[in-house]
Swiss-Prot record:
This is Uncharacterized protein MG288. It comes from the Bacteria. Belongs to the MG032/MG096/MG288 family.
Length: 414
């Protein structure tokens, strides 16, 4: 059966064209079939299914696909008196129409009206959001321009100590003051760890070269302010700057009049891109290979010694050659190769990159290589492994320096 109806509601009118297919269950026996002819009531089940042909609104928007999806394969069941259904077909059609309107059309209409209202509200919200986003975008563009200029200035601060000093001066910090320098380094490190670390390593090498300019240690007020009265922590000048066993140091200082005069110092960078392996909140205490950098320090001395006093009479029993004179070459290979076995030593100072007590404590991995031309003295150095000594423990464990002091020295002199 084909139907076509118009429904009006709100500000909209829809035209619906549909088929209604009905089917009863089969008669179970002959008596039921006879009852249908003698006027007796016959109750049975009626299955009926709506089929949507077309649904359009007053603007000729075709909603047929949506209606078909909503109705889908709906199948309706009702207990029906066949006698009344056949003889009172108009009533049954009205009943079917009413039921269809109630169960299909009205819910569908409410759903679409709600969907329309939701859509209009969503569009209003989106329009408001777009307006806010446009305003925010304009502010962000202005802010980005300002930040870009600041970022360029910030990036320039990593180039050298003078640029670092000038940048932080504009940020109202006087980094010639050690406390403010440490505070600036903390901020800089939080913003860009590797660039700050690279600045510190480069400052280490340059400050060392400047400190020993003209082959003499700097005893100026700036040097004392940066490194204290004790002077630079590494590398130190003379016998004090050489790593060796307590036994050999005792022999050379107690038995001889050894003197070492600095004739040259050269530093060569071997890693152009220093990096630091930051773990969560910092460098772990026994972290191996915590940072990547490398430079070599070549130092030349002219010096010598001889046994003094009574020790000169017992030279064969002193354990060291009776005298030495000539040139001494010292090479320090400095890097971040703190290997697993090294960091597990009981007297290992720790893989430090730590701000503490107005300092930036920093653990170095160092190899020391000492060479002299004198055969006897060189044999002694080899016996002590000073020709290729890896600083690991005891009197020759890895040194810890205040890394910030080297940058501070350059800042004071810039």
């Amino acid at each position: 059966m084909d139907f076509e109806v118009d429904y009006e509601g709100g500000n909209n009118t829809v035209n619906l064209q549909f088929d209604l297919k009905a089917q009863t269950s089969n008669f179970l026996n002959l008596q039921e079939l006879q009852n249908s002819f003698n006027g007796n009531d016959l109750n049975t089940q009626l299955f009926w299914k709506p089929l949507i042909n077309k649904l359009v609104d007053k603007n000729q928007n075709d909603l047929t696909s949506i209606a078909k999806t909503a109705v889908s394969d709906s199948l309706f069941l009702s207990n029906t008196n066949i006698f009344n259904s056949v003889l009172k077909i108009d009533e049954q059609l009205d009943l079917a129409k009413t039921k269809f309107e109630k169960e299909i059309i009205e819910p569908f209409k409410k759903e679409r009206e709600k969907a329309k209202a939701d859509y209009e509200e969503q569009q209003r919200i989106l329009a408001e959001e777009r307006r806010k986003q446009e305003e925010e975008l304009k502010r962000k563009e202005e802010e980005a321009k300002r930040l870009k200029e600041q970022q360029e200035q910030f990036n320039k601060s990593f180039e050298n100590a003078k640029e670092f000093k000038d940048y932080w001066k504009n940020q109202k910090k006087d980094v010639t003051d050690k406390t403010q320098l440490i505070d600036a380094l903390k901020t800089s490190f939080a913003a860009d760890k590797n660039k700050t670390f690279s600045l510190l390593i480069n400052s280490f090498t340059k400050a060392t070269s400047d400190y020993y300019k003209n082959n003499k240690k700097d005893e100026s007020e700036n040097a004392k302010k940066a490194f204290s009265e004790k002077g630079i922590q590494f590398p130190r000048q003379g016998l004090e700057g050489l790593y060796m066993s307590d036994w050999l140091r005792g022999k050379l200082t107690s038995y001889t009049d050894i003197k070492l005069n600095l004739t040259s110092i050269k530093i060569e960078n071997k890693e152009n891109n220093p990096t630091i392996d930051w773990k969560n909140n910092g460098i772990e205490f026994r972290q191996h290979y915590p940072y990547k950098f490398k430079f070599e320090i070549d130092i030349k001395y002219q010096g010598g010694y001889k046994l003094t006093g009574l020790f000169s009479w017992f030279a064969p029993f002193s354990g060291i050659p009776s005298s030495w004179n000539g040139e001494m070459d010292v090479k320090f290979i400095v890097d971040g190769d703190l290997d697993y076995n090294l960091v597990q030593n009981t007297d290992y100072p720790g893989s430090l990159f730590q701000f503490k007590d107005n300092q930036l404590l920093f653990t170095l991995h160092v190899k020391e290589q000492i060479k002299v031309q004198d055969g006897k003295f060189m044999d002694l150095l080899k016996q002590q492994n000073l020709h290729n000594l890896d600083l690991r423990n005891g009197a020759t464990k890895p040194p810890v320096v205040d890394l910030a002091s080297y940058l501070h020295y350059l800042v004071l002199n810039s």
